[in-house]
Each structure stands twice: as structure tokens, then as C-alpha cells.
Amino acid sequence: MARFNLATLLVTLFLAVCTFSFVSAEGRGPVITDKIYFDIKQGDESLGRIVLGLYGKTVPKTAENFKQLATGENGYGYKGSTFHRVIKKFMIQGGDFTNHDGTGGKSIYGNRFADENFKLRHSTPGLLSMANAGRDTNGSQFFITTVVTPWLDGKHVVFGRVLEGMDVVTKIENTPTGSRSKPSVDVVIADCGLLPDEPAKEAAEHAEL
């Protein structure tokens, strides 16, 4: 009887640990697999840097598209493009590196690709989500929310969030705009790319010493 009780206790403890681990992992939110930087300029003024974390485990295809467009490894991408649409208390939109007005852009998979999934909600400001022209029309255009936008759930794919530089997003949000919500002075992604993995970077720095 004592042996049975011990076995039962061990099984119960094991299940409790597994459950706690699962809940803890879920509580941390989506896994960030890559960090992308945007260095922003408006006219001759540097507005600062935005660092974006990509949810490559939850939406790997969408995250990979954004990453490769940020690095420009295919010969085209976000560098030099603008935030062409800015709506206060809503979002800032960019990613049209072909026409620069919201009518263009393309993905690394061709012109357009399908909605990957809608697992993540627009539940907080600072989320990175795909702009589209309807179902399964993702290309290169994206937006960053500045408020909670639940009406976009199930229509736009959330694939990352702002890790640093929300103050820069706010500067862009507050810039004067003209027709079609286009900034009066172009807001440009002057430089962009993939930030090195911090543990790998630290190891390399120590190796050089």
C-alpha cells in the first residue's frame, strides 16, 4: 500500500510540474525568434531606432518574409522605403518598396501569399501585423499598432511586436499628414537588418579578448 501511495504521489507531482511548465510557457507569450532593427529618418532628422521581435515559432512563413525583406538578401526590401500611411490613434503603415504609396510591394514568395494563421490577436499597442487588400493577399506591407485594435483580429496576421523604440513609433504617429494619410515629410527606413543573437554576440566578443 505504501508503495502504491508513493507511485501515485510521484505521478501526481510529475503531472503538476508538466502543467506548471506549460502554463508558464504560455504566460510568456509567443516566442521571439529574431530581432529586426529599423533606423528611421524624416528629412534630415534622425528619429531613432525601432527594434522589432518576430514570432517565428507561431507564424514562421510570415516572419521569414519580413526578415528577408529587412536584410535585403534577395536584392530588394525595406531599406529606403517609407511609412506611407499614418493614422493617429490607430497605426503606422509601411513596406511598399516598389510604388511607395500603398499600392505595391511584393513578398519573398512571389507577389502575394496566403494568411498563415490568426492565432494571435491585436490585443495591445506596438504589435506588428500584415497589411493586405483582403483574404490571402499578403505581400510586403505591414503596420505597427498604436492602440488596441480588436476589429483586425481574424483579418490581419500578427507576427511580431515592438521591443524597443515605441517612442519612435509615437513620433511617426504624430507627424503631420496630407491626403490619404501620407506624412507631409517622408518618414524613411534609412537602414534596417537583423540584429545578432545576443548570446552569440557576447561569445564572439569574449573570444576576441
Curated annotation (Swiss-Prot):
GO terms for cellular component: endoplasmic reticulum lumen; fungal-type vacuole. One of its GO terms (molecular function) is cyclosporin A binding. It catalyses: [protein]-peptidylproline (omega=180) = [protein]-peptidylproline (omega=0). Gene3D superfamilies: Cyclophilin-like. Inhibited by cyclosporin A (CsA). PROSITE patterns: CSA_PPIASE_1, CSA_PPIASE_2. One of its GO terms (biological process) is protein folding. It is found in: Endoplasmic reticulum lumen. Transmembrane segments: none annotated. SUPFAM superfamilies: Cyclophilin-like. A motif (Prevents secretion from ER) lies at residues 206-209. Residues 37-194 form the PPIase cyclophilin-type domain. Its EC number is 5.2.1.8. Keywords: Endoplasmic reticulum, Glycoprotein, Isomerase, Rotamase, Signal. It comes from the Eukaryota. It is an enzyme of class 5 (isomerase). Glycans are attached at N138. Residues 1-25 form the signal peptide. InterPro entries: Cyclophilin-like_dom_sf, Cyclophilin-type_PPIase_CS, Cyclophilin-type_PPIase_dom. Belongs to the cyclophilin-type PPIase family. PPIase B subfamily. PANTHER family: PEPTIDYL-PROLYL CIS-TRANS ISOMERASE, PEPTIDYL-PROLYL CIS-TRANS ISOMERASE D-RELATED. PPIases accelerate the folding of proteins. It catalyzes the cis-trans isomerization of proline imidic peptide bonds in oligopeptides. This is Peptidyl-prolyl cis-trans isomerase B1.
